[in-house]
Design a protein with these regions (language model features):
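Short beta-strand segments enriched in small/hydrophobic residues
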Residues: 1, 40-41, 102-107
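Beta-alpha junction/loop-to-helix N-cap segments that form part of ligand/metal-binding clefts
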Residues: 2-72, 82, 136-141, 170-177, ...
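Extracellular/periplasmic Venus flytrap/periplasmic-binding protein
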Residues: 23, 68-69, 77-185
Length: 201
């Protein structure tokens, strides 16, 4: 209970679909009389929910969607975030790989989380050289062509070579990358997000 009122939790599954998420949130606010909503997981869904919260003048607590735009240029006063955002991820990732003589290719999903993550990562690196951004659909399960484009951009580069993966949900590319033995065959390292605490110190 809060202030003598019983809390009721209603779960709704947006299935990672922005249009479905939008209609479910509108229904929660109007039909279920929800005062606050929490979620979603997908940044793409979160972007679709922002104007709904503003229209109904009700709070949307975004967690764990991480695209910067959620509390950046698309933000409104009904939106709150409890977790990290893409820029925080990017800064910590840059700390790990941003060294002179390093060449980087990014591999990301083609939606708000992936694009915001790459944008923030590009802004955070100062010493390494980013030579290509590879974006794949969220529902990708065959990574062969995308990985080949990554290899083609990196294999002949001098110095350390890194593919920075910015991926959330769906089928992640890590098993496909490991199967290609990039380090053994081409000297290409695979890097991805990690703990941000040391980078924030």
């Amino acid at each position: 209970q809060v202030a003598g009122k019983k809390l009721v939790v209603i779960e709704k599954d947006d299935q990672g679909k922005p249009d479905l998420g939008k209609s479910l949130l509108a229904s929660a606010y109007s039909d279920d009389k929800a005062d606050i909503a929490v979620g979603p997981t997908s940044s793409g869904v979160a972007m679709a929910l922002l104007p709904v919260a503003e229209e109904y003048k009700k709070i949307l607590l975004v967690e764990p969607a991480a695209a910067d735009a959620i509390t950046g240029d698309k933000w409104n006063k009904y939106i709150f975030r409890t977790g990290r955002n893409s820029s925080q991820d990017a800064i910590s990732n840059a700390v790990a790989v941003d060294k002179a003589g390093t060449t980087i290719v990014t591999l990301a999903q083609d939606y708000a989380f992936g694009r915001d993550g790459v944008k923030a990562f590009k802004e955070a690196i100062k010493n390494a050289k980013l030579v290509h951004e590879e974006y794949l659909p969220q529902n990708t399960t065959d990574f062969t062509a995308g990985i080949q484009r990554v290899v083609d951009k990196l294999k002949d580069q001098p110095g350390r070579k890194v593919v920075m993966v910015i991926w959330a949900g769906g089928t992640p590319p890590y098993a496909a990358l490991a199967a290609q033995e990039l380090s053994k065959r081409f000297g290409i390292d695979v890097a991805t997000g990690g703990n941000i605490l040391s980078a924030m110190a």
